[in-house]
């Protein structure tokens, strides 16, 4: 089984990935530079630990002297003071900035640490720590020389080394008490504690505390996000090269990248992630009327880009739009400031050890914060569980690859029971959508399962056997969560790989373990249809409502509800589309259990009210389309006319209107208006095209003239395009305007072609926000949704129809007002599903 599509870079972004990774390797620090940084940081941390011990010994010695000088009455007063001395003056040292986040680039020479103090840091403490730190560094490190200088104005200690490159390490002194005091003042409380006269600048201490929060947030949210750190490094280099981008440098850039990449519904490669960030900026998020960037590390609502003025915001937005155009037309190397790569790169030998680009410097093991020393004395292995948790957290976005684990079920069963004989029981369904049923006998017990291929059916059989034996199947443990959620028995959850289950009833009773085996396929009714589409045929105008949304960003659970005749049906899934399908499936099985194929066929056999242009002499008596006829593709030809020489509808695959002749819907001209009447088939909710516009292929530009293609000569098609999955042959003359496939149900309130009622033109005026979907499920075609979940007025990235992108709220296509850049209605979004 091939690797899961979710973790493969989209094919259209492969070139971008190559350029981004090539640029990243060029700006990434060398191993020598990283070793120099690591040595300086670790030396300083160890020296600060010795300084903390020295201060602790001094304070304990003073406490003992005070205790000896006092009498019995005074002992009661000294007990609290000795208790306070048990806590060190220096609480710990933490890495912040580029070192903590792993964002170092070539030439970055400034490193930062934060030294936490028990009390508010003072000038006296700063000088004492600085003097002793120089002594400890000389004793600790003999091969290198460090210059230590206190900077009272900035509340820091600056350390410089004498080697090349000349690194500068800044230690910021601060204390949590500084922020607590500010919060109390803001709440109107009176402060009883009087600060010492030589206390350090409060604002500098607050800034150091903020940098500490930023580092912790980044490690929790951005480090585990695929491609996020790489994109931030690329954009840091862009901010250094292009002055327009410099106001975004630092914390705002990190927030923006995490927000743009983290809201995606799947892991993305570096090229796609960079384009998503550029789209986010180009949409106007920085503009005065945009959504802005909220600082998640502040209790009060704080704008992280408040320091950027209006002109700078406009300049950055314009630059991002220009960069987005360049990347869309294959000129990403100009944005990155590099030469274009050759089309074929020589493969590097894989013997080289791969570089871990996420973690530049390993975490500190020499310095342990003093406040946690008692715990460490009890158990030295106490840190191991935390490390494991962090590793699991970092892996969590990549753990969405459940299908990769599912393929191990067959291997696992073969290891446990070698020599099993899998038998093909039956093969049903049409030639283009076969359904295989395989069986295997294990310990005298027979197991059966179905799938679109023999290999997939064998996998399903193996899953059932392992479940019956009570062994893990290799799937993720999401099934346990499914059992906890109160949902109808008929609901199942779909996982990314496209494995179609047999719609016929299986003799084995359906149990929660059966649900596990059926998890991998699309959600279909007993007729092999999308449940939402079939329910819409029976009851129109249904409204689906989102009841609840639970789980973290990597494991969402949605509950959708639909009400029919006073009865409410709920469905649960990993996204709204899946939950909606489950709700529709529950309603169908409850309200329409007697639905049969014969009824559907009767409805489909109704003759069309109007014959389209593609119908030369009406439908033939043979109801089945020619399986080997040409023009059966799904309109992938970008304007090329497919002549359906052998089919019954002479307009390409006639009812789709994709072919060279004018049949069905023709949206290439006059703004998406069909120009003819439409007959609505009440039985199947499918509209058949009337007199279509005679324009043929419309112009790419806004003009009244258009090119009308003559009937092309029969042209051999090199490859037989796949037919629709799990759909039956269409009745003659009945247009497929109702739905382009079983997976055309979009999110939200997007309308389908088939929902137009009446006879006044199915899509007159080009209105509505139509959602294009391929006939196959999205997991087969590799299509993935590419829209923003966190930004308003965000359009979808258009890969097939040209540059039909919208930035902000402008719904017009790239070049023209009403004529779309690609084929179809200009408001028709070609999006990844």
From Swiss-Prot:
Q: Where is the composition biased (Polar residues)?
A: 775-818
Query: Can you list the GO cellular component terms from the UniProt entry?
Result: cytoplasm; nucleolus
State the residue spans of region: Disordered: 65-86, 339-403, 597-651, 702-762, 775-833
Q: Which residues carry this modification: Phosphothreonine?
A: 70
Q: Which gene encodes it?
A: ilf3
Q: Which domain of life is it from?
A: Eukaryota
Record bears the keyword Transcription regulation: yes
Q: Where is the composition biased (Gly residues)?
A: 640-651
Organism source for this protein?
Answer: Danio rerio (Zebrafish)
Q: Which UniProt keywords apply?
A: Antiviral defense, Cytoplasm, DNA-binding, Nucleus, Phosphoprotein, Repeat, RNA-binding, Transcription, Transcription regulation
- Localized where? Nucleus, Nucleolus; Cytoplasm; Nucleus
- InterPro entries according to UniProt: dsRBD_dom, DSRM1_ILF3, DZF_dom, DZF_dom_C, DZF_dom_N, NT_sf
Q: Where is the composition biased (Basic and acidic residues)?
A: 373-385
| Gene Ontology process terms (BP) | defense response to virus; spliceosome-depend formation of circular RNA
Q: What does this protein do?
A: RNA-binding protein that plays an essential role in the biogenesis of circular RNAs (circRNAs) which are produced by back-splicing circularization of pre-mRNAs. Within the nucleus, promotes circRNAs processing by stabilizing the regulatory elements residing in the flanking introns of the circularized exons. Plays thereby a role in the back-splicing of a subset of circRNAs. As a consequence, participates in a wide range of transcriptional and post-transcriptional processes. Binds to poly-U elements and AU-rich elements (AREs) in the 3'-UTR of target mRNAs.
Protein known as: Interleukin enhancer-binding factor 3 homolog
